[in-house]
């Protein structure tokens, strides 16, 4: 999300977690990251604030992650590609202006889709 709204967004997340008494097993990570020029990087709109939430695998995570994603997206955030998220192909197109060019390169260097799983196939085929 834009750096200017990062701390307030983190504070809002802490407020709703406390209000709903959601179980949290790990500390959140808050980082300020400079902009980059990588087509599909969440940081290419930078400078950005990055808030990472993790949950122990045996603890419920669905409510925590769903609310966090909604809050972070409303603040202009984009999820890390290696984390759980609910982006659709249309979301990717709206959030990443170079998405179709990325898909074209992906198809050229991996024509059989060897490096795609089911979710990535939906987003990048």
Question: What do these predicted regions represent?
Answer:
Residues 77-125:
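Activity-critical C-terminal alpha-helical subdomain
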Residues 1-94:
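Substrate-recognition/cap regions that form aromatic- and gly/pro-loop-enriched pockets
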